[in-house]
């Protein structure tokens, strides 16, 4: 309706009143509705039509004279848009970082993004009206947008504000918003996203219009026979309606409650302080509705079509006033068809609108509480529980009313937080004015639907579960594990290789392998051969000599074969053994099958001759190659050659000590001297090395391999008393310069052309054991140098070391040189020379966490240090500062005060650390990872990626499983608010009308029945508790269904009378299903009959009829009516007619549709002459029904002669009859 500026002039010759005021105001659509209603009340329908004709003529004339046009210069953008978009982008960047750190998962990030940009778009839309009002009040865009005719504020907002969030073809909101408006122009990406919404609007306009028309047809079909036939059905039942719902300042809610009351009929007298202000069967007008709202706060009992006793009809008082005029509905009115058209018609019209956002955002359902002024907030921490908000922020949840106090400088204010609210601040926290401190849960839950979202791995590597991720025991053997508690899942970086990529059939744990990326042409000349040499003397197994020929890869330009010798300790004994000299040829052992025919093939490597069978099939454990290099041990020497020739001098004696450790199963918890359950890092046998005899030039050894019965999970923890320096060396080899080696002998064959051999470290990696112990299909994990990074703990060494360390060399060593990272390479005690390291006790430390609970409790060891002067120093885990327990300075031999302030982090082997955590004094951790080695001054960290998994999510892999990039990692299950616009709302109205199994009504029926059964059984006993609870549950479901349908329409400003929807819902719940428990042969089990018919037959028969109430959809209800002609004209004509002929059904032609089909007179129409008397049904309206309470009790308890839902014993029936006679 356009804006009309009109004048109602005083016309004494035409208007009957002389005191008509002069009215000069801009009239919008709502004001014109009120004007027409007042004109009808004062002048009647005929005179009002003449006034409206004059108003229409004046409007068209004024619109022609005005001639409003729209130009591009009229599109003015609000000046505040720039900083609003910039602020939203900054918030989105913070949300992206939190997701990268693992603090929030993908669903929470999407929610945050949607809320941020929706709030920005809405604020910009609200700024649009004041901007026009101040700069250009007569702007044509401004005038058109507020006219109510064409072009709403949301559409103008796309022209001068920002387009905002769009939806994809599936209706899901895209988290990338369109920041520009149509005046500024769209970028290519924004245009493509905008096309989604445009195409969706075109398709919806065509498809949804047809759906809305079909919905209207079904709605009319199910209620076409309902006509007002009686004045009063005599029922005393009804429903309670609250006049005010919510806070009184919410004017929109008051208007909604007023519209519900207007036109209804009271089912009981209304008293205020013992004074009757309204009587039963009195219709409620505007004056009485306002009086009830102003005077009452408790619910009002009104009549409704739900409880009308008329069979297949409806009475005048249960329906109430007509929606066309302010009088009771006339007899003969076809209210069923009116109800169907009233619900279906708005859907048909509103589908012509284009809603590109995919739904009205429902984030404003929760009510926010803000601080009134600056101050410190205080509350009882024992009454709140830590939780997470739906956006992933930490918060507190209060189950009961929580009293909080805000203490400002000049004032103190107490606030009460309602139950089930979220508190977003901590105790004793300083809050600023208007800061959000609590979020109150909405009283009525919005439409929600459960959605599954898959999270895919962004990293190739190995899966690890945090100790905070628990799994149900019944799913241990399955591949899908449900998560019982919120926690982290980690993907530890590592490459996956197998026989199909790089052929390594003889790989071992901690072996170094040569891995090249895929090339254009990749062929395999030979596999890797492991030279397993055993030098035996007596019964002792001394050491192992390994020789590996690395993988051969061929490209079109060059070929490379590298051969590598490596020495490693294989088996250890606590004592030393002398080894006698013995020579033995090295041999290659292969575990394959072959025949006995051989051929010689010379590999261009100077040390080996291979024998390969002609058929190419090798035999298991057969010797097919010999090495030309002999390895020998001199007679009588003590292990002089278990090391490489690169040693500066050979050691004479080596003493090996065995340290003890605890082995346990994965996930097992062990009690260690405390009541605290401590999860341990998986360890295996560790070795303490000690060089006894000093030599002129020191020689060091590195542990390369450890033999265990089974490859273990997690970490191998090893402590070395003396730290061996690793180094980079250069070998004089023209074909392979700059080869890095350590305790190894490297050979590169001469096939490399033009010096194209590459550094070993570039494609070399360490084979890592699988945590789950699986060794199937020959696949294994290789950790390349790119999977590691190193972080230096302290740059300034003078704070913790002596002066002789000033010339210490700390090169950035290649991780690949370590020949396998096996654990702690250095103890922390070496940081404090001549001091003793003591672990005193375990303590619990509270630290802010980002998953599940906002405060997570974990274990931190409490350390004490004792130096050579026997002075004990305490390490405070809360401050990370070492302090002297007895004196001001912990280092008594030095006077520098800086020693007291030196800090170091508490880290442990195998610890998983997220990104941005400060463990170094210089900078935070650059990326997430797992600590795999602890050095004297640095940490070696394996790259990892954390993923946050919430409760009820499912993990699609086992612990320790190797995953490729892009594999499905987690499936998150979350609740999403259903969009409430009319395009997305029409399917929801159809879903509710058809009573689908997945709607909220069906889900709440069972829970509501159980709740009411418990309450009623407690008050009335089991005899009537079950019966009344079943009846109340059905009534509550009817009301809930009406409210849900109304919510969809009201979200778009469409007002539909509740009585129209109640007529539809009444037909959906009017049928019952005969059960098989009864013994009466009147109805067949499984037959659908009308409830009133079942009640009548139940009263007439000796035996009870057992049935259960049903919630039928409108389609099914239309196919189960009393008229088979109406059913056959709707759907399934052949089946309906054949079934009716076989059953011998008779159609009594009581509805409108069947009479129209047969050409008869329809049983509807107004204008009947009825004699009205002062009494209605024999009851004086001035006195009322004095036996109203007695009739209510009868109607509740003895509406049936026998209780139909449940069978009771004979004494129960006897008690039932005695009580009935007393009431009579």
Curated annotation (Swiss-Prot):
GO terms for molecular function: DNA binding; DNA-directed RNA polymerase activity; zinc ion binding. Its cofactor is Zn(2+). Keywords: Chloroplast, DNA-directed RNA polymerase, Metal-binding, Nucleotidyltransferase, Plastid, Transcription, Transferase, Zinc. GO terms for cellular component: chloroplast; DNA-directed RNA polymerase complex; mitochondrion. Zn(2+) binds at residues 233, 308, 315, 318. Binds 1 Zn(2+) ion per subunit. InterPro entries: DNA-dir_RpoC2_beta_pp (IPR012756), RNA_pol_beta''_euk (IPR050254), RNA_pol_Rpb1_3_sf (IPR042102), RNA_pol_Rpb1_4 (IPR007083), RNA_pol_Rpb1_5 (IPR007081), Rpb1_funnel_sf (IPR038120). It catalyses: RNA(n) + a ribonucleoside 5'-triphosphate = RNA(n+1) + diphosphate. The keyword Translocase does not apply. CDD domains: RNAP_beta'_C (cd02655). Its EC number is 2.7.7.6. GO terms for biological process: DNA-templated transcription. It is found in: Plastid, Chloroplast. The keyword Zinc applies. Belongs to the RNA polymerase beta' chain family. RpoC2 subfamily. HAMAP family: RNApol_bact_RpoC2 (MF_01324). In plastids the minimal PEP RNA polymerase catalytic core is composed of four subunits: alpha, beta, beta', and beta''. When a (nuclear-encoded) sigma factor is associated with the core the holoenzyme is formed, which can initiate transcription. DNA-dependent RNA polymerase catalyzes the transcription of DNA into RNA using the four ribonucleoside triphosphates as substrates. PANTHER family: DNA-DIRECTED RNA POLYMERASE SUBUNIT BETA. This is DNA-directed RNA polymerase subunit beta''.
């Amino acid at each position: 309706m356009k804006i009309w500026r009109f004048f109602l002039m005083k016309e004494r010759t035409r208007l009957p009143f002389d005191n008509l005021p002069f009215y000069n105001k801009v009239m919008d659509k709502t004001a014109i509705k009120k004007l027409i209603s007042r004109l009808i009340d004062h002048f009647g329908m005929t005179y009002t039509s003449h006034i409206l004709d004059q108003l229409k003529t004046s409007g068209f004339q004024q619109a022609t004279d005005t001639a409003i046009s729209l130009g591009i210069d009229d599109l003015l953008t609000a000046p505040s848009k720039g900083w609003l978009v910039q602020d939203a982008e900054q918030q989105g960047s913070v949300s992206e970082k939190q997701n990268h750190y693992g603090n929030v998962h993908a669903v929470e990030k999407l929610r945050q993004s949607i809320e941020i940009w929706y709030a920005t778009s809405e604020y910009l839309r609200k700024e649009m009206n004041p901007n026009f009002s101040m700069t250009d009040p007569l702007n044509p865009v401004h005038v058109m947008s507020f006219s109510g005719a064409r072009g709403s504020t949301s559409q103008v907002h796309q022209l001068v504000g920002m387009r905002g969030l769009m939806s994809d073809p599936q209706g899901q909101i895209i988290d990338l918003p369109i920041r520009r408006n149509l005046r500024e122009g769209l970028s290519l990406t924004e245009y493509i996203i905008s096309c989604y919404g445009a195409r969706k609007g075109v398709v919806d306009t065509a498809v949804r219009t047809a759906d809305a028309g079909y919905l209207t047809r079904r709605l009319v079909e199910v209620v076409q026979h309902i006509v007002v036939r009686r004045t009063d059905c005599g029922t005393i039942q009804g429903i309670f309606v609250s006049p005010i719902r919510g806070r009184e300042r919410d004017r929109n809610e008051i208007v909604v409650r007023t519209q519900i009351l207007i036109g209804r009929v009271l089912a009981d007298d209304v008293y205020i302080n013992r004074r009757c202000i309204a009587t039963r069967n009195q219709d409620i007008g505007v004056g009485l509705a306002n009086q009830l709202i102003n005077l009452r706060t408790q619910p009002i009992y009104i009549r409704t079509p739900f409880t009308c006793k008329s069979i297949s009809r409806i009475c005048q008082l249960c329906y109430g006033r007509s929606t066309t005029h302010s009088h009771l509905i006339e007899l003969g009115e076809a209210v069923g068809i009116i109800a169907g058209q009233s619900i279906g018609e708005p859907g048909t019209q509103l589908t012509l609108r284009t809603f590109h956002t995919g739904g009205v955002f429902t984030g404003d359902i929760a009510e926010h509480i803000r601080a009134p002024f600056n101050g410190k907030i205080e509350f009882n921490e024992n009454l709140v529980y830590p939780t997470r908000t739906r956006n992933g922020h930490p918060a507190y949840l209060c189950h009961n009313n929580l009293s909080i106090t805000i203490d400002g400088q000049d004032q103190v204010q107490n606030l009460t937080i309602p139950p089930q609210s979220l508190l977003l601040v901590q105790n004793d926290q300083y809050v600023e004015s208007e800061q959000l401190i609590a979020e109150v849960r909405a009283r009525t839950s919005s439409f929600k639907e459960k959605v599954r979202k898959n999270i895919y791995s962004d990293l190739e590597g190995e899966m690890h579960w945090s100790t905070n991720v628990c799994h149900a025991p019944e799913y241990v053997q399955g591949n899908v594990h449900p998560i019982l508690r919120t926690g982290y899942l980690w993907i530890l970086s590592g490459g996956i290789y197998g026989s199909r990529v790089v052929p390594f059939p003889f790989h071992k744990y901690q072996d170094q392998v040569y891995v090249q990326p895929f090339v254009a042409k990749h062929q395999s000349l030979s596999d890797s051969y492991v030279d397993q040499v055993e030098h035996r003397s007596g019964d002792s197994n001394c050491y192992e000599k390994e020789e590996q020929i690395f993988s051969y890869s061929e490209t079109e330009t060059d070929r490379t074969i590298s051969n590598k010798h490596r020495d490693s300790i294989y088996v250890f004994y606590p004592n030393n053994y002398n080894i006698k000299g013995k020579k033995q040829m090295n041999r290659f052992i292969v575990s394959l099958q072959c025949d006995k025919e051989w051929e010689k093939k010379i590999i261009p490597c100077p040390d080996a001759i291979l024998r390969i069978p002609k058929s190419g099939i090798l035999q298991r454990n057969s010797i097919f190659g010999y090495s030309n290099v002999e390895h020998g041990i001199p007679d009588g020497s003590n292990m002089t050659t278990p090391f490489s020739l690169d040693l500066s001098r050979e050691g004479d004696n080596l003493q090996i000590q065995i340290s003890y450790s605890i082995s346990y199963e994965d996930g097992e918890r062990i009690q260690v001297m405390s009541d605290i359950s401590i999860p341990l890092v998986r360890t295996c046998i560790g070795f303490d090395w000690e060089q006894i005899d000093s030599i002129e030039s020191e020689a060091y050894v590195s542990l390369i391999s450890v033999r265990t019965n089974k490859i273990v999970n997690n970490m191998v923890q090893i402590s070395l008393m003396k730290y061996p320096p690793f180094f980079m060396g250069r070998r004089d080899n023209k074909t392979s310069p700059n080869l890095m080696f350590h305790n190894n002998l490297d050979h590169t064959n001469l096939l490399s052309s033009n010096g194209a051999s590459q550094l070993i470290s570039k494609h070399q990696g360490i084979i890592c054991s699988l945590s789950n112990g699986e060794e199937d299909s020959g696949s294994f994990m290789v950790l390349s140098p790119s999977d590691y990074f190193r972080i230096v703990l302290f740059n300034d060494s003078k704070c913790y070391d002596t002066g002789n360390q000033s010339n210490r060399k700390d090169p950035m060593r290649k991780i690949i040189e370590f020949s396998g990272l096996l654990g702690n390479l250095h103890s922390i005690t070496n940081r404090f020379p001549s001091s003793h390291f003591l672990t005193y006790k375990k303590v619990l430390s509270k630290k802010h966490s980002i998953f599940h609970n906002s405060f997570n409790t974990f274990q931190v060891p409490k350390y004490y240090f004792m130096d050579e002067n026997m002075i004990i120093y305490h390490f405070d885990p809360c401050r990370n500062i070492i302090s002297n327990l007895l004196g001001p300075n912990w280092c008594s031999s030095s006077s520098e005060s800086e020693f007291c302030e030196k800090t170091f982090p508490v880290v442990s082997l195998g610890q998983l650390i997220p990104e941005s955590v400060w463990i170094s004094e210089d900078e935070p951790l650059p990326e997430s990872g797992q600590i795999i080695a602890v050095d004297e001054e640095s940490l070696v960290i394996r790259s990892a990626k954390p993923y946050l998994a919430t409760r009820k999510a499912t993990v699609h892999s086992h612990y320790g499983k190797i995953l490729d990039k892009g594999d499905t990692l987690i499936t998150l299950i979350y609740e999403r608010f259903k969009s409430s616009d009319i395009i997305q709302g029409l399917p929801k109205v159809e879903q509710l009308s058809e009573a689908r199994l997945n709607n909220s009504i069906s889900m709440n029926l069972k829970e509501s029945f159980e709740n009411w059964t418990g309450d009623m059984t407690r008050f009335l006993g089991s005899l009537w508790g079950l019966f009344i609870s079943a009846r109340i549950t059905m009534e509550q479901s009817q009301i809930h269904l009406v409210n849900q349908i109304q919510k969809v329409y009201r979200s778009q400003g469409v007002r539909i009378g509740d009585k129209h929807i109640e007529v539809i819902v009444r037909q959906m719940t009017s049928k019952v299903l005969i059960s098989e428990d009864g013994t009466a042969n009147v109805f067949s089990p499984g037959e659908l009959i009308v409830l009133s018919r079942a009640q009548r037959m139940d009263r007439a028969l000796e035996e009870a009829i057992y049935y259960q109430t049903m919630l039928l959809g409108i389609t099914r209800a239309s196919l189960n009516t009393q008229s088979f002609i109406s059913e056959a004209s709707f759907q399934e004509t052949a089946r309906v007619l054949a079934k009716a002929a076989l059953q011998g059904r008779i159609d009594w032609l009581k509805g409108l549709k069947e009479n129209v089909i047969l050409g008869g007179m329809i049983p509807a129409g107004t204008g009947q002459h009825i004699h009205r008397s002062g009494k209605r049904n024999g009851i004086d309206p001035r006195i009322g029904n004095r036996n109203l309470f007695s009739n209510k009790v009868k109607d509740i308890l003895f509406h049936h002669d026998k209780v139909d839902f449940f069978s009771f014993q004979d004494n129960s029936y006897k008690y039932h009859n005695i009580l009935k006679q007393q009431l009579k």
